[in-house]
Regions:
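Active-site palm subdomain of RNA-directed nucleic acid polymerases
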Residues: 101, 106
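Charge-rich, well-structured scaffold segments of protease-associated domains
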Residues: 1-43, 69, 76, 94-96, ...
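His/Glu-based metal-binding/catalytic segments typifying zinc-dependent metallopeptidases
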Residues: 43-99
Length: 241
């Protein structure tokens, strides 16, 4: 950990992002006061791309009433053009809206999940796609069955033009609301400078979301949600589920 810190936590990997009413000159003055004395250093290149993922299933003993499951797979990296397709897929499957596929299937129709969400996290050379569900232990087998049923729908059923447009419109709306928060905007700008070296206008992001086709969604679903490549971790009171 210390070696990683010393290698990567260097000035060339630092971005100061500010969203405020302060004049730019004041922001620079404050930054120089706190960071101006740090010696100049560059990160040492040499990270090896992640390889060797092997799907696996594990059940862990967990002495609680509620059971937990995480299902996931490796996914697109931060520079993969398919990241917009998987972001849209993720939002439809288990995003924050009440109309996500998993929320409707497990909570609205069956009432068997306390917590339910899916996540996509891209990194520099790989990515992570995951689904989390918390439910009563007796309901967990059914919850897992329903999750896989919804994943199968994404792999096998092409989205209609109207459903695709609705999903794109919803994702763009969520993005518009998120950047109304100065903190969210500040963090997004800093991350984009670190990862891409630029900050794209929100209109460009909208354009890329709108460019995702039903075929793109079908392709990324079959790649990322392939049953043979999914790993699963269960926490419950039983040794078998």
């Amino acid at each position: 950990i210390i070696r990683f810190r010393d290698t990567n936590y260097v000035p060339s990997n630092v971005v100061i992002s500010s969203v405020s009413g302060l004049p730019l000159a004041s922001v620079i003055q404050i930054a120089e006061r706190f960071f101006g004395d740090i010696p100049v250093a560059s990160a040492v290149s040499g990270r090896q791309p992640f390889t060797g993922y092997t799907p696996r299933n594990e059940i862990k003993k967990y002495s609680r009433h509620q059971a937990h499951v995480v299902i996931g797979n490796i996914a697109c990296h931060a520079h993969d053009p398919r990241r917009y397709a998987i972001t849209l897929l993720n939002n439809m499957l288990g995003g924050p809206a009440m109309n996500s596929r998993l929320n409707i299937a497990l909570r609205e129709r069956n009432g068997i999940a306390y917590n339910l969400e899916s996540n996509f996290q891209p990194f520099s050379d790989t990515g992570l796609f995951s689904i989390y569900c918390g439910a009563d232990e007796t309901h967990m087998p059914r919850a897992i069955e329903l999750i896989h049923k919804e994943l199968g729908r994404f792999r096998n059923v092409r989205l209609s033009a109207s459903a695709l447009h609705t999903a794109q419109k919803q994702l763009k709306g969520q993005l518009a609301i998120s950047i109304e928060s100065h903190q969210n905007e500040m963090l997004a700008m800093g991350k984009n400078i670190l990862v891409y070296g630029r900050v794209d206008p929100v209109e460009e992001i909208y354009r890329r979301i709108d460019a995702v086709s039903a075929s793109d969604l079908l392709e990324i679903a079959n790649h990322t949600l392939d049953p043979s490549q999914l790993s699963m971790l269960i926490f419950n009171n039983q040794k078998t589920t």
